[in-house]
């Protein structure tokens, strides 16, 4: 095995001081290393989730440009698994005690994913048969096509915790506006109440309160950053509220996410970007509610699937 240890404070110093040329060298070396790997396990942890918040955006862009080929090689050509270490910092982000968070972490990671898999496959089959998606809710009225694109159920094979069924919008099909009610942490910067307006698949307006400037800078990373690369249902019944950690939040039962940036190769709509930013909206009644339709048929209302065969994917009441 090959072991690589990274520290967030050292990463910040590298990101703040390295030139684009130096990051190109780092990227080439890491790509060569990844090309020699059969499998990859990533365990992330740390005390300060905001460590990278002061790194200039142009430095982050240079790093993403250099390291994106490494990520794509890992995703496409290795057996991989990503998870987090349940640290005190993560508990603090989630507004939980360390003990409470540890219990929650192991409960969500070690749940019986096999029991969810049949319903997730049924949902994926419904998505693959559908042509159009329409989503409505507070501040949200958006529609797009998913015609001809695969739908992938994720039930504990790669990420832990897991629990989503994803596809991708046809690249030029999304029209409408959407409001994301779940806090988002991206590149070390906290964002709240992100709002996007899309026309023919392109984000033409984006705002996030006092972080609107930072939001638009990230969306200007490259042309693909203003187009959607993923649409997914969150279906882990044990995750019912935000943790400010996307590995958990994108799986929240009763949620969906739309993703500006790179599409996954297994559900490839052709969008390419150096970013992949999952933005989450919770549609439970407590969060404001909302509906999702496939080809005009209501499949989820206020975070609850309407079909009995999908009920196991609804938020846990325990």
Where are the predicted features?
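Long, well-ordered mid-to-C-terminal structural blocks that present hydrophobic/aromatic surfaces
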Residues: 171-217
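Short, glycine-/Ser/Thr-/acidic-enriched flexible segments
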Residues: 46-48, 87, 140, 149, ...
């Amino acid at each position: 095995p090959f072991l690589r240890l990274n520290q967030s404070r050292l990463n910040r110093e590298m990101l703040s001081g390295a030139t684009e040329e130096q990051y190109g060298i780092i990227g080439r070396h890491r790509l060569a290393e990844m090309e020699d790997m059969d499998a990859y396990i990533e365990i992330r942890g740390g005390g300060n989730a905001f460590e990278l918040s002061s790194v200039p955006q142009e430095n982050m862009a240079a790093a993403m440009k250099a390291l994106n080929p490494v990520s794509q090689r890992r995703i496409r050509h290795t057996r991989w698994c990503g998870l987090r270490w349940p640290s005190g910092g993560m508990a603090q982000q989630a507004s939980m005690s360390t003990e409470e968070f540890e219990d929650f972490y192991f409960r969500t990671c070690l749940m019986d994913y096999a029991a969810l898999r049949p319903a997730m496959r049924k949902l994926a089959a419904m998505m693959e048969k559908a042509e159009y998606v329409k989503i409505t809710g507070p501040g949200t009225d958006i529609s797009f096509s998913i015609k001809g694109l695969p739908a992938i159920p994720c039930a504990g094979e790669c990420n832990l915790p897991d629990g989503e069924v994803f596809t991708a919008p046809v690249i030029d099909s999304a029209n409408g506006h959407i409001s994301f009610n779940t806090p988002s942490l991206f590149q070390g910067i906290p964002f709240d109440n992100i709002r996007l307006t899309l026309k023919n698949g392109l984000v033409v307006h984006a705002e996030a309160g006092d972080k609107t400037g930072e939001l638009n800078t990230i969306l200007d990373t490259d042309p693909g950053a203003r187009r959607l690369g993923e649409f997914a249902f969150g279906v882990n019944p044990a995750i019912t509220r935000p943790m400010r950690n996307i590995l958990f939040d994108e799986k929240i039962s009763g949620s969906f996410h739309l993703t500006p940036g790179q599409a996954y190769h297994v559900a490839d709509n052709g969008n390419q970007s150096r970013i992949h930013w999952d933005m989450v909206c919770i549609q439970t009644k407590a969060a404001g509610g909302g509906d999702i339709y496939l080809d005009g048929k209501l499949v989820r209302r206020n975070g609850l699937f309407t079909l009995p065969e999908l009920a196991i994917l609804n938020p846990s009441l325990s």
